[in-house]
Amino acid sequence: MAFGWHSMHGSIIWFLQIAQLSTAISHDQNATAVHFLISNLFFLVSTGALWFELCAIFCDSSSSTSILSTSLLMLNYFSLKFSATGERHLVATNIAHIEAHTSIVGFMISLFTPLKETIITKYEMLVRT
């Protein structure tokens, strides 16, 4: 009887550890995605983006479209900022910001690869002019 209880207890402990690990990973991924959206949201608000544009982005039913729309809005802002002030480092910072977040959250990699290429292409075009 003691062996059966010990075996069952070990299985329960193992199951609980796996459940805790799974929950922690899920929370980390969600927190990273939420942090990315919130940091971009406050950045956009602080740079003068219109509230109705933000509502249109975040009220979208597709979260992947919302993330992409937010980043495209940032890209448009950086393009305007670059042409107005000639600050190339802002565009480079945006590229590094997107690369850092795509390496953390796996499902964002496929979403941001075309966007990253667009940013790099746009940056190269602006540098040449």
From Swiss-Prot:
Entry keyword set = Membrane, Signal, Transmembrane, Transmembrane helix
The membrane topology noted for this protein in its Swiss-Prot or TrEMBL record is: Multi-pass membrane protein
Signal peptide positions are 1-24
Transmembrane segments annotated in the record for this chain: 38-58, 95-115
Can you tell which superkingdom this protein's organism belongs to? Eukaryota
As for subcellular location, the record says: Membrane
- What does the entry list under GO cellular component? membrane
Chief place where the protein resides: membrane
Other remarks in the entry: Partially overlaps HRT1.
What is the protein name stated in its UniProt record?
A: Putative uncharacterized protein YOL134C
List the source organism: Saccharomyces cerevisiae (strain ATCC 204508 / S288c)
